[in-house]
């Protein structure tokens, strides 16, 4: 069946129309219908008629009106020849026609539907349009476009349609009488448009350019090709056979076929289909690269097809400034050339540096202050160093290392003079200078050295006291019997005994209480060698941060992790099993695989979310070793033993629905000859100043009371440990003396038995509060009720935030037989 016969076949959504021209003018040629009700024929129209006649002679199955309508050049010329008429409405419906068999590459059903949907083009020129409102028709067309939006391939060619003059009213009435149903498009109707002439002229979209002087009745419509299954119900109901689709065009030669990538994983462009037309082929190649999305809605004829704007990104400079793009015709360009050249001369060596320690971006220049420091030239040289808080301190450069930052490849390990070693760390070169004014911070000078009359070591103090006693022996007057002699509050002159020499016990207590660092001269040869080795090993810490649970903690001291782990900048430690890793990916994988959610051992205390676990070092040796390695990052003078058998570990945890999170711990020997109840105690920095330290101290003394011994922590204590213990001791003693301020006197022995604190610790604490005096060769406590109340009001002696409730403690002291296993027993 030819396409001319299909035009008379009703399709889905259309009603078969009767040839109206035959009823009114049966003898008139089809080409004359184009001029009904219109102006006289022009030479262009005569040429169109001749062209249609030639098409009919050549065997074309299309009418002259259709061929004329599909000629873009002739339609444009006809529109120019006609006088501009008043535009009543704009028809934006997509109209197209299958003109050549070579362009039909779809199935038979697709061709039939496209022909039946738009075969009314020629009939619309012959018959007047139906009196149907414009707005509903546009809404129906928009609904069809939305239904077929998911099946859009690419935009089709642009066609021109010239609106014809209105037909006589009589002919319009005849059409209304014959058509019983509205010509509404069916929901199954799909638009199918191919190229006008794929292999000839007009195949390029640039050939169809809208003349800006064209009358407004010329509409540019963009049509899309929608591949979808069609249902030609009207044709099937009539029983009309469908024509077989024409054979596809022959494939091009082998040399025209693009080469296939050698590898299926090749990232090269995919070759286009060989049966596509040149225009579709070019569009296919353009769409294979990222571009703008395909426009589905028809464009306005007055809209220009502009290329996408060029993406102009701001230029990121070393000063983090956004430089805007300026046009070539700007007058400011020539005036600022000289200024830019001067700035380039000044900033020749301007680079960016990202400080890994302070997480700040700084600008470095080529001045001498940014040059590399040679530590070997002057190891004891003192520099000015800016800390992270902005203060400038005097310090010493101890070590250097190379970083991944190309702009500032060197970092330096510095020690601040007069500050604790836990504040040492790695800093960038821009934070070190010979002049404090170059760093731009508040300069903090170290504490002044001790006065000549104040000893720096116990040996010097003993020498000064001996000289003072010899000089004042002849001038000393007899003291009154009732005069009270309080110990001095100053730690360096605590013992006010001008007529006595300091004993070895007093010297040891003085060094322990004040954490006096012994000089190498006071140590034996073996001890001095070990101390020097310890300082050389622990002087430099390479692990800057510790990722532990939800916290990233800055480390304080050196810890002897293995070589590859000890030099890592960030160490990742699982908070449940204490396994350490170097890489974040390994840490994330381990957290997913680790099934432990609490420390090993048994839980001996639980109140609220506070839990304490007792872990035997002999049973869980690996876990205890890992715990000690991690604790060494925050403890200076801590001795690590690979033999964990003699120790018990008490781990304090906060428990929630995810598990038990380690807060701190303390360890103790199973059997101590000196009755030490704490060998090592630590609260992690994120949990400090929350009362957990005093809670662990109180728990250790509670265990000592249950064992029936009076315990004390191992000495020396760190600076933070000494403050915590002194605060706990002071509050405990004040609470005991608060109810005993009667005429009878309380003794140090009674306080020791009630509190579990040793005599030496009680004397040290009362001396710091000026509540003890030395009278007739013994220490006597002399306090009043007002003195106790005044001390309890001080912030350092306030009540602890957390206390131990013995009702929740499930623990009994272990006997010697349980601690030390009898020989010969296995297991």
UniProtKB/Swiss-Prot annotation:
Alphabetical list of PANTHER family matching this protein: HISTONE ACETYLTRANSFERASE, HISTONE ACETYLTRANSFERASE KAT8
Cross-link (Glycyl lysine isopeptide (Lys-Gly) (interchain with G-Cter in ubiquitin)): 372, 483, 532, 539, 715, 749, 776, 798, 801
Entry keyword Cytoplasm: no
EC number(s) recorded for this UniProt protein: 2.3.1.48
Gene: mof
Post-translational modification: Autoacetylation at Lys-638 is required for binding histone H4 with high affinity and for proper function. Ubiquitinated by msl-2.
MYST-type HAT domain residues: 538-813
Compositional bias annotation for Basic and acidic residues: 141-150
UniProt family annotation: Belongs to the MYST (SAS/MOZ) family.
Residues annotated to bind acetyl-CoA: 681, 689-691, 693-694, 718, 727, 774, 798
Organism (species): Drosophila melanogaster (Fruit fly)
Outcome, altering residue 48 to S: In strain: Africa-1 and Africa-5
Listed name of the protein: Histone acetyltransferase MOF
Entry's Gene Ontology cellular component terms: MSL complex; NSL complex; NuA4 histone acetyltransferase complex; nuclear chromosome; nucleus; polytene chromosome interband; transcription regulator complex; X chromosome
Zn finger limits (C2HC MYST-type): 571-596
Gene inactivation effect: RNAi-mediated knockdown in male salivary glands, decreases chromosome X gene expression. Simultaneous RNAi-mediated knockdown of mof with RNAi-mediated knockdown of Mgtor in male salivary glands rescues the decrease in chromosome X gene expression.
